[in-house]
Curated annotation (Swiss-Prot):
One of its GO terms (biological process) is viral translational frameshifting. Residues 1-27, 92-128 are annotated as: Disordered. Belongs to the encephalomyocarditis virus protein 2B* family. Residues 111-128 have a biased composition (Basic and acidic residues). This is Protein 2B*.
């Protein structure tokens, strides 16, 4: 049976920053640029995606395909077509291909100005 064991530290490597709060954008840049998947694409990729037991055993990060990318940044040769295709396919499977693009530090500041950013809130905002 699958049992979820909460981890005491999500990012054990001090060099790994959280892509959510953008505290260490340089840590994400190799993965983001080579995969061409934006922050919003990754976030949307993870929303509602079930995690299997293998996922938790294999990845010590909590954000799925981003964790695979970050885990392999220490091994540049691993960042090849196979891993790239896997991460990109994960987000495309969740209908996030429209949010793909290189990570930009201005993305979080000007996220509402992005053409491909379609939050569910916009529907309520326009209809109210």
């Amino acid at each position: 049976p699958f049992m979820f064991r909460p981890r005491k530290q999500v990012f054990p490597d001090p060099r790994s920053g959280s892509v959510i709060n953008g505290s260490n954008p340089t840590a994400e840049r190799p993965c983001q640029q080579s995969y061409g998947i934006s922050f919003y694409g990754f976030a949307r990729c993870q929303r509602g995606r079930p995690k299997s037991n293998e996922d938790y055993k294999d990845i010590k990060f909590s954000i799925g395909c981003m964790g695979k990318c970050k885990r392999n940044t220490k091994q540049p040769r691993v960042l090849e077509a196979a891993l790239e295709q896997m991460c990109a396919a994960d987000c495309r499977d969740d209908n996030s291909s429209d949010a793909s693009g290189p990570f930009d530090s201005a993305l979080l500041r000007n996220i509402d100005g992005r053409r491909d950013y379609k939050p569910d809130k916009s529907v309520r905002r326009n209809s109210s």
